[in-house]
Amino acid sequence: MAEGEKPKARIIRIFEISAFDPERGTFRGVNIRFEYPVGSGNYHDIVIPLEEYTPEEAERRVREWIQKYGGIIGKTL
């Protein structure tokens, strides 16, 4: 991140969960909770299967989420 540039998102919490998917059944995963935009108080969650989790993968998925959905956050329709 460039000097003076504000962060777009802040990872708040990372924790393991058990979740249910109708196609796969019960599985273990890692929940990534992040605030976007920073300071807004809006929190979002991404679940990554436990086998796929690495800190780098979590960061990549948060960035991917922001690119895909971040543009509509806060828009008045």
Feature roles, as predicted:
Residues A2-S40:
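N-terminal acidic leader/helix
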Residues A2-K8, I14, S40-L77:
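Acidic, low-complexity intrinsically disordered segments
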